[in-house]
A protein has these predicted regions:
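Residue-level signal for pocket-adjacent positions within structured domains
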Residues: 1, 6, 81, 95, ...
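Conserved beta-strand hairpin/beta-sheet module of binuclear metal-dependent hydrolase folds
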Residues: 1-45, 126-137, 142
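Short Gly/Pro-enriched turn/cap motifs at secondary-structure boundaries
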Residues: 6-8, 97, 117-119
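Short, basic and Ser/Thr-rich N-terminal targeting/leader segments
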Residues: 11-12, 109, 122
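Conserved S/T- and glycine-rich ATP-binding loop of Class I adenylate-forming
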Residues: 18, 55, 118
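Active-site HxH/HxHxD metal-binding segment of metal-dependent hydrolases
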Residues: 23-26, 33-112
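Metallo-beta-lactamase
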Residues: 92, 112-117, 122-152
Length: 152
């Protein structure tokens, strides 16, 4: 498994591009802010997005979803509990095609991921476990736990 980290937007949100070395397709996790720039970098690596996976629905994690999905047609996954977040926190209505929840297993682009529902930062926050790597969104911050004081 190959993992590339892009720090995007003014909050320097961690966006991850993950792929199986044997596959041309990849997954994008939390494409905040700059969809065009993220997609340009993915293409520089010779990859094609097979799906967008969201750890939660806040604007700094979903900002690039619409443009990437519109250009590639790839599906977008989010936990259903985040569909009712305040639009002020989500940059408008969240674009998605599928919902997932606790215990769901995904097989995308030669990668197997397990969804772990971790509410607190948002009602629908999830962590995504792929092999021995956990993508935690804002459930964890560097050196501390994530914030739980935000509305929604």
């Amino acid at each position: 498994m190959e993992i590339r980290n892009l720090r995007v937007g003014s909050y320097q949100t961690n966006c991850y591009v993950v792929w199986n070395e044997k596959e041309k397709n990849c997954i994008i996790i939390d494409p905040g802010y700059t969809g065009e720039e993220i997609l340009e970098q993915v293409r520089c690596w010779g990859k094609t997005p097979a799906a967008i996976l969201l750890t939660h629905g806040h604007f700094d994690h979903v900002g690039g979803v619409k443009s990437i999905a519109a250009e590639t047609g790839c599906p977008v996954y989010i936990c259903k509990e985040d569909l009712s977040l305040d639009p002020l926190m989500t940059d408008g209505v969240i674009h998605y095609t599928h919902t997932y929840g606790e215990g769901d297993c995904l097989d995308i682009a030669g990668l197997q991921l397990k969804v772990l529902h971790t509410p607190g930062h948002t009602p629908g926050s999830v962590c995504l476990l792929c092999e021995d790597v956990m993508f935690s969104g804002d459930t964890l911050f560097a050196g501390t736990c994530g914030r739980t004081d935000l509305k929604g």
